[in-house]
Amino acid sequence: GVLTVFGEGEITDFAAGEAPWYAERGAVRKLVVESGVTSVGIGAFSGCGLIETVTLPLTLGRIGDGAFDDVYALKNIYYAGSIAQWKAIDIGLGNSFGSAKLVCADKTEPFSDISGWYHDYIITCYMADIVNGRPDGTFCPEQNVTRAQFVMMLYNMGGRPEISDTFLGFDDANAVSAVYAAAVKWGVKAGIITGFTDNTFRPNAEISRAQMATFAYRFLKLGVSADVLGGLSGRNDFRDYGSIAECYRESVDVMANIGVIQGYPNGSFVPNATATRGQSAAVLSRLLAALTELRT
């Protein structure tokens, strides 16, 4: 069924299970919020897990914390404005938007150079505040990514949590730019970063595809139980599997088995090749979707 919410002003905040439409949540597959509504309150549609599509108006300026919490079936969000206008909406924490596809009525692109295969992945990551573009309006999808830059993307994906002062301990800690310092400290504390055997992190070195898979896998482990992860292992069939260093194989196996990383058309993974911004966006977009699926 379709639930239509109309009127002027705010949809009020609701405690769990107290919204008037909550009792009918099992029948609602589509939600339409009509023009005039300016805010969706805290917990408004929380628990309406079978909603698959949501239509939102240009008048909307705020979505409260948990307004769409546990809306696990959500596939599509239709918004009356542009991507830039969507980004301006104050969206609170705990909303199940991670793997949903955003469709904007205004097709204006946020970047001028993303017409390739990576387009949708970049848009997904941009909408989730994982990546940003350049001041000139480009994204530079073919540009290589450094280790510090990829950790920054994961830090953004994790919500940029506040981090107490953490001693990095790497011999090259002074090479970590202030721009990436909080992200790298978070990465160390979360166990995503371990560094090399010579006790360096090498923040400005370009990240390899195998390293990217490993960092992504460690991020996945923060949000998915060990029991679930245990069922995802198993050697993959990349034709160049033998060239994957032993320390990266578990990560590559799991990430490939759940579709977060993919190989090239010839069946190879090329673990030592440098990852680009477009490839990084693809991996992180798929990781968002995997986290949503594996947590449900």
Feature-to-residue mapping (PLM):
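Consensus positions within tandem repeat domains that build extended binding/scaffold surfaces
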Residues: 21, 41-44, 64-67, 156, ...
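Mature N-terminal segment immediately following signal peptide/propeptide cleavage
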Residues: 123-131
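Repeated polar recognition positions within modular binding domains
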Residues: 17, 41-47, 62-72, 205-206, ...
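Extracellular, surface-exposed repeat architectures
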Residues: 32, 93, 97-106
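Acidic/polar low-complexity surface segments
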Residues: 12-24, 85-97
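Feature responds to low-complexity, polar/acidic, surface-exposed segments characteristic
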Residues: 106-117, 132-182, 190-210, 218-248, ...
